[in-house]
């Protein structure tokens, strides 16, 4: 027999599916969709506005660029009119910010995010919600993508630094919810040290509406010491910079139980005792589908893998449902943990927290290593506007090749808007460029530079190159919406010299 709790979960799922099906039917007609956004209840208009924004985003690169831009302008106009009428106006400004971003118009996007935060703060003060002195952390972003761990890590650091006012952080977890975090172990055993996770019954609509403005949008704008940072990644870069200036330790440290657990599994995976390893995570289309500007191929990392192995290191491949290693690939000291029986969220935390460094791509699993303060080298990276690692970490960006050109554009192009903003499938086509995958040789050279950094053997030329790139990113505003902010992490010196 079904328990009441099972029935509640089933009904909740059916309601969500029914609503999404209804939205899908409405959105099949553009005229009807725009009519619906201006009609009906305020709550329905807000919900459908967000859905239809994603519908339009899914068409970028698939329709003529001029037509797409006109559609964005039309939708933005409608959203702005609705924002004037709705006390929850920030809901519309977030959609407007996303839409302008998709066109590469960062100036208009930043203005929208600025309005988002101002209107939300005004509402909180007007309704006296600030007296509760709490911030709600929505659990769902941590279920949708592991990369949001990085946003939360930066936010928590800003709170600990006192740059953001210290408030009680609460994550309400609905009872009987079907929610499944991308890493259950990290949330319940580490994140819970900073955020109170409370089980709650289904909240009445009137209460949900009251506390919704207190919910922290992890990817949204932040106010730091009185200044609004409309672009979240710029604020997070500041978090890393300030954290290092105060010489603080990572927020998280692996506990003894997990350390013993991880060592036992390592032995069963075949790693020799006391051997060191590098975590390798390469985004492909096996888990969340294809995104050409972020996907990479395992064989491009062969030289880098051989380089690590030649030093006596091991390579542990991370991920979920990763593309199986082809039979003719004979990688030395290589463990395909991603496709092993031992893969689980607890072991993911152990591996990311104990690696000598994390070799990743434009996919969020590296943020686990970030929270534990491990060295990071990201390859085939985009967008550069989201670079918010530590000052000793490395990013090897994808270059862009403009339509009709035979060779890639210089490095400074990918550091400049709109190309530094490419973060949706289709933006390449819209902007008339192709993102170029890093060559195996460049990936291997970046790994060698990381080793020199870890061993304290960097040359003066390399150190000067890092400073030069930081000045370049400040000049080009690679991190948008800041106050003379530069990217604090490194681009490998050989790459800067080769492609400038």
Where are the regions that the model predicts?
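N-terminal targeting/anchoring "stem" of glycan-biosynthesis enzymes
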Residues: 2-500
């Amino acid at each position: 027999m079904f328990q009441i709790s099972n029935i509640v979960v089933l009904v909740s799922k059916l309601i969500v599916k029914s609503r999404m099906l209804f939205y899908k039917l409405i959105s099949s007609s553009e005229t009807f969709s725009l009519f619906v956004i201006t009609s009906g209840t305020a709550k329905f208009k807000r919900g459908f506005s967000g859905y239809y924004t994603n519908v339009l985003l899914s068409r970028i690169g698939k329709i003529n660029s001029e037509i797409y831009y006109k559609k964005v302008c039309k939708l933005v106009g409608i959203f702005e009119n609705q924002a004037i009428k709705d006390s929850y106006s920030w809901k519309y400004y977030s959609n407007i910010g996303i839409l302008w971003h998709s066109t590469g118009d960062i100036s208009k996007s930043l203005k929208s995010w600025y309005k988002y935060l101002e209107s939300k703060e005004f509402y909180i003060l007007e309704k006296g919600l600030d007296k509760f002195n709490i911030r709600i952390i929505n659990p769902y972003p941590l279920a949708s993508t592991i990369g949001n761990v990085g946003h939360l890590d930066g936010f928590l650091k800003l709170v600990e630094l006192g740059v953001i006012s210290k408030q009680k952080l609460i994550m309400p977890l609905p009872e009987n919810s079907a929610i499944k975090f991308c890493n259950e172990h990290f949330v319940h055993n580490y994140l819970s040290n900073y955020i109170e996770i409370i089980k709650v019954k289904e909240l009445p609509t009137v209460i949900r509406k009251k506390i919704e403005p207190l919910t922290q949008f992890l990817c949204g704008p932040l106010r730091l010491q009185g200044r609004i940072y409309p672009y979240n990644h710029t604020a997070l870069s500041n978090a890393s910079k300030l954290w290092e200036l105060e010489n603080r330790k990572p927020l998280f440290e692996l506990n003894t139980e997990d350390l013993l657990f991880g060592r036992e599994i390592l032995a069963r995976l075949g790693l020799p005792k006391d051997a060191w390893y590098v975590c390798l995570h390469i985004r492909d289309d096996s888990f969340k589908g294809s995104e050409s500007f972020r996907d990479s191929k395992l064989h491009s990392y062969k030289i880098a893998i051989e380089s690590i192995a030649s030093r006596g290191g091991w390579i542990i491949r991370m991920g979920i449902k990763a593309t199986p290693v082809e039979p003719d690939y004979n990688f030395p000291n290589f463990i395909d943990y991603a496709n092993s029986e031992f893969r689980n969220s607890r072991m993911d935390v152990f591996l990311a927290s104990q690696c000598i460094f994390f070799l990743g791509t434009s996919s969020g699993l590296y943020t686990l290593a970030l929270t534990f303060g491990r060295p990071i080298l990201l390859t085939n990276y985009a967008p550069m506007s989201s670079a918010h690692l530590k000052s000793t970490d490395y990013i090897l960006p994808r270059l862009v090749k403009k339509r009709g050109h035979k060779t890639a554009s210089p490095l400074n192009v990918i550091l400049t808007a709109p190309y530094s903003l490419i973060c949706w499938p289709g933006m390449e086509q819209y902007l008339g460029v192709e993102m170029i995958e890093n060559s195996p040789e460049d990936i291997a050279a970046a790994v060698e530079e990381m080793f020199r950094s870890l061993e304290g053997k960097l040359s003066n030329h390399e150190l000067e190159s890092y400073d030069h790139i930081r000045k370049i990113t400040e000049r080009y505003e690679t991190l948008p919406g800041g106050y003379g902010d530069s990217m604090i992490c490194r681009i490998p010196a050989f790459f800067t010299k080769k492609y400038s």
